[in-house]
């Protein structure tokens, strides 16, 4: 894509070559070359010279065009403010390019999480849902950490994880991720997979091990052994990588009204730490 030093789309006049279709002409002359642009769009300090006619396909940008040009001036200048770290220059370029196309598809080399973020920012629901679908299809044990980080960058807790940062498009992705983890733990447990659990937040491990959907053997002892192995590997991982401030985790057998199960125990760091006990199961 032709870009100058200010990351603006090139506005140099050029002789148009014959193209095979009007859509090709619009994309090449309009978006790539910025010919006859009438709108300056600013997103996170990056400037794009585009066309109000096509930007109007975004309900968010259309509203800004109307609000920022009450006198009907020939040229528009609009800005979209956001601090979302997933809104990047590359993702903005791709999403903006889709306004000049019919039925755009998200290429494999584009960060689909960033595409979802920009699509949500600009109110492009169809593209956002397509990005969400691609994220869901990409979920597997190896991608679990990045998916969870995308859903909840600050690890605010399970409620945020279940909804995600863009609830209309990300709610349900965490449940899908947990389901993949259930299936892997039950059918393909191995040391390599256990390592993938080392970096996940404790609340995620808790949710995984306490669920009735996780069937491990015929007794609570089998679940205890599995949970204990995971907790030990997480402790070893933190020690080897000098990760501090996470507190300690342990697993205990628990008895309640004749039934036996396990509990995951998390002891937070600091002098005022309190023991948090998470019930993982209640199996006889």
Swiss-Prot record:
Instruction: Quote the subunit structure annotation.
Output: Interacts with cul3.
Q: Which organism is it from?
A: Schizosaccharomyces pombe (strain 972 / ATCC 24843) (Fission yeast)
Name the GO terms of the biological process aspect. Answer: protein ubiquitination
**Which Pfam family, just one, is annotated for this protein?**
BTB
For this entry, the protein name equals BTB/POZ domain-containing protein 2
Q: What does this protein do?
A: Probable substrate-specific adapter of an E3 ubiquitin-protein ligase complex which mediates the ubiquitination and subsequent proteasomal degradation of target proteins.
Listed InterPro entries: BTB/POZ_dom, SKP1/BTB/POZ_sf
Main location class:
cytoplasm
């Amino acid at each position: 894509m032709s870009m100058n030093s200010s990351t603006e789309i090139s506005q140099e006049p050029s002789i148009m070559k014959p193209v095979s279709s009007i859509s090709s002409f619009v994309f090449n002359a309009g978006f790539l070359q910025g010919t006859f642009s009438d709108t300056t769009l600013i997103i996170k300090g990056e400037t794009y010279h585009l066309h109000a006619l096509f930007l109007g396909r975004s309900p968010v940008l259309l509203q800004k065009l109307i609000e920022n040009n009450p006198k009907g001036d020939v040229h528009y200048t609009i800005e979209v403010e956001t601090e979302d770290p997933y809104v990047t220059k590359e993702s903005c370029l791709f999403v903006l390019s889709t306004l000049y196309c019919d039925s755009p598809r998200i290429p494999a080399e584009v960060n689909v999480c960033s595409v979802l973020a920009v699509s949500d920012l600009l109110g492009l629901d169809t593209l956002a849902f397509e990005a969400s679908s691609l994220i869901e299809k990409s979920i597997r044990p190896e991608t679990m950490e990045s998916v969870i980080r995308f859903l909840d960058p600050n690890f605010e807790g399970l409620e945020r994880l279940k909804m995600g940062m863009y609830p209309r498009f990300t709610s349900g992705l965490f449940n899908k991720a947990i389901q993949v983890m259930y299936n892997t733990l039950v059918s393909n447990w191995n040391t390599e997979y256990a390592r993938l659990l080392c970096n996940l937040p404790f609340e995620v491990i808790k949710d995984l091990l306490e669920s009735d959907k996780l069937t491990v053997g015929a007794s609570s002892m089998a679940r205890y052994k599995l949970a204990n192995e995971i907790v030990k590997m997480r402790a070893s991982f933190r020690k080897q990588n000098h990760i501090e401030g996470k507190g300690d985790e342990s697993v205990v057998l628990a008895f309640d009204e004749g039934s036996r199960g396990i509990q995951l125990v998390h002891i937070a760091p600091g002098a005022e730490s309190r023991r948090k006990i998470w019930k993982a199961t209640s199996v006889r």
